């Protein structure tokens, strides 16, 4: 299986102006992995699809080699700056690569990620629970305002 194309899809909430970018990595076998970045779509698209971008860099590569490809993307982006939107673009592509690897190997992504970043057999055993973490947009001035924002967003 080889990477043939990386597609970006711009999404924007017209009410609050927040932008998202969906990234799809396509392969020669018809498989597609999906990732996402909370960054301006035009900039994410430029990092991925410009003549020196991530799409050309990864074309023909095996998408299941996620860690090697992450390092390749990171090394390649030194001239762009390895912060902000560039890292968001790399992260979106990486997520799509993990999705493809999970599909190719018939394993859940969380298991692949967990096992790839642990060093001993004991550490690699699945855990019954983990501490969740989430990043959210600015929450507002108080809890009531936050509840109202979340409730309004859920109704849309």
Across the structure, where does each feature detected by a protein language model lie?
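Structured beta-strand/loop patches that form or line metal/cofactor-binding pockets in enzymes
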Residues: 1-39
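A broadly conserved amphipathic alpha-helix scaffold signal in soluble, globular proteins
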Residues: 94-102, 114, 134, 151
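Residues at beta-strand starts and edge strands
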Residues: 19-21, 52, 130
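Metal-dependent enolase-superfamily TIM-barrel catalytic cores that perform enediolate-based chemistry
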Residues: 119, 125-156
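N-terminal amphipathic alpha-helix/helix-capping segment at the start of soluble metabolic enzymes
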Residues: 1-16, 107-130
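Metal- or metallocofactor-binding catalytic centers and their adjacent structured scaffolds
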Residues: 26-104
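A generic structural signal for short
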Residues: 11, 86-87, 137-139
């Amino acid at each position: 299986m080889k990477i043939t194309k990386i597609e970006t899809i711009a999404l924007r909430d017209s009410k609050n102006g927040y932008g998202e970018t969906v990234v799809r990595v396509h392969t020669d076998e018809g498989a597609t992995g999906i990732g996402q970045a909370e960054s301006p779509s035009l900039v994410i698209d430029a990092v991925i699809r410009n003549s020196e971008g991530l799409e050309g860099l990864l074309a023909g590569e095996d998408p299941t080699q996620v860690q090697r490809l992450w390092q390749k993307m990171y090394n390649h982006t030194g001239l762009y700056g390895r912060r902000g939107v560039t890292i968001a673009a790399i992260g979106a592509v990486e997520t799509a690569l993990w999705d493809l690897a999970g599909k190719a190997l018939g394993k859940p992504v969380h298991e692949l990620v967990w096992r790839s970043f642990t060093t001993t057999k004991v550490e690699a055993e699945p855990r019954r629970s983990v501490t969740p973490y989430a990043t959210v947009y600015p929450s507002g001035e108080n809890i009531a305002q936050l509840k109202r924002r979340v409730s309004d967003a859920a109704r849309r």
